[in-house]
Amino acid sequence: LIMKLKVYIYKNCDTCRKAGKYLDNNGIKFESIPIREEPPSVKELNMMLNIYKGDVRKLFNTSGVDYRSLNLKEKLPKMSIDKAIDLLSSNGNLVKRPFVIKGTKGVVGFNESVWKNLFL
């Protein structure tokens, strides 16, 4: 059984396009999911949180409009992990993208050397 790569993307995001092209060029099949319409689940977010050693800020799109308009730079340090995860699961714009899951592995953002180790 081959684990399918789940890639949450936003179609107008350059980084997401680069990531998709990278996967295509390397012959890696993946399921593309629109992050705004279908944000990652609480379960997936918690799994990713474990991968990033509990650093919830790493899961946030800190350069996004919603992050700034919700003043999360100030609020996030005082927020409970559960509340932060709920926020992410209810607003795909807040999630760092691409948000990628393969079985129990995962990664946010696109970094070619990291992806090479994980997926090739």
Regions found by a protein language model. Give the residues of each.
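Thiol/selenol-based redox catalytic cores and closely related redox-interacting motifs
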Residues: 37-120
